Curated annotation (Swiss-Prot):
The keyword Iron-sulfur applies. The lineage of its organism: Bacteria, Pseudomonadati, Pseudomonadota, Alphaproteobacteria, Hyphomicrobiales. One of its GO terms (biological process) is isopentenyl diphosphate biosynthetic process, methylerythritol 4-phosphate pathway. It comes from Bartonella tribocorum (strain CIP 105476 / IBS 506). This is 4-hydroxy-3-methylbut-2-enyl diphosphate reductase. [4Fe-4S] cluster binds at C18, C105, C204. Its cofactor is [4Fe-4S] cluster. Belongs to the IspH family. Dimethylallyl diphosphate binds at H47, H83, H133, S232, S233, N234, S277. The keyword Metal-binding applies.
Amino acid sequence: MSGLPPLTIRLCGPRGFCAGVDRAIQIVLLALKKYSAPVYVRHEIVHNRYVVEGLQQRGAVFVEELDEIPEEHRNQPVVFSAHGVPKSVSEEARRYNLFYLDATCPLVSKVHKQAIRHQRHGRHVILIGHAGHPEVIGTMGQLEDGAVTLIETIEDALHYQPGDPDKLGFVTQTTLSVEDTAGILDVLQQRFPTLAAPAAESICYATTNRQDAVKAAAKGSDLFLIVGAPNSSNSRRLVEVAEKSGARQAILVQRADEINFENLKALSVVSLSAGASAPEIIIDEIISAFRARYNVTIELAETVVETERFLVSRELRDVILTSQDMAFVNGQANNAKNENQNTDMFTTKAE
C-alpha cells in the first residue's frame, strides 16, 4: 500500500499534436531520411522548442530567412513551416534555385485559397487574427499589399471603415476557434450584412476540439496544466479556457521541471492537456513527475476521437517512417491506455 497521497490526473482527449503538426514533423524527418542532413527549415516547424531541438539533433537546421542558407548547401532541401509562408518566400526560393518542401498545414492552405477566392469575387479580405503570428503573416502575404485588413479585437471591428462595405469577405487564423472569433464576427456581420464567410471546411477542427475537451474537464480541477510554448497561440488560449471553465488554477508549462510542486496547494484533481504543437512525450514526463509524489489514478476525459490524417509531400511518399523515428515526440503512445492499473473513464460533455 503506497504511503503517497492520492491524486487523480484527468487526462484530456484530444490533446497535443493535430494532424497538421504531425504532418509537418514527418516531412522534416522524411526529408532527413531521403536527402540526408542538413535539411533546412524556415522558421520553427511548429511552436515547440522540444520538437525543434529534437529535429536539430537529427540534422535539421532552422533559419528565419532563406538567405541564411550557405551557398554550398543550396542543393539541400528547405522545408516551410506548418504556419504557412507569404508567396514572396516561395518566389525567393525559386530565385535561389532551392528545392523546397511545403509543410504548411492543409487547413491553413485552405484559408489561403479562400482569401484568394474572396479577391477573385471582387471582395476586400478581412483576416481575423493576431498581428505578428507567422500564420497571419503567411495569409496576408498571399495577396498584394492593401488587399487584406487584419482585425484583432472587437474595437478594431467597430472602427473599421472599408472602401466598399458591400464587397467584403473574411477568413480567420486557424488557431482561433469559432468561439474565439464570435464577438468580432457579431460586430462585423451587424455592420456589414453582406460580409461573405469562408467555406466551412477551412475551420480548424483541432483548435475547437482541444478547447471543448478542456472546458469539459475543468470543473472540479484543483490545477489544470496545459503543455505548450509561450509563443503558441492555441496553448495560451487553452489556459484561458481552463480558468473560465472552472479550474481553480491553470498554468502553462513546457516541461515537468517547470512545475513548482512545493508551491502547489493541496491537490485532489489535476487536469492535463496540451496545445496542438506539444508532444505526447512531455505528457508522459509530467505524469511520471506526479507519480513520484502521489499515488496517481488516471481518468481519461475524452470528448471526441480525432481520425484526421494529412498526406505528406508527394516527393516523400516513397520513404518509410517508423514509430521509432517519431518516438522522440510520441513517447508511450496513449499513455493512460497502456496502463493496466489505476485507469478510469471520466464522462465528459462540452457545454
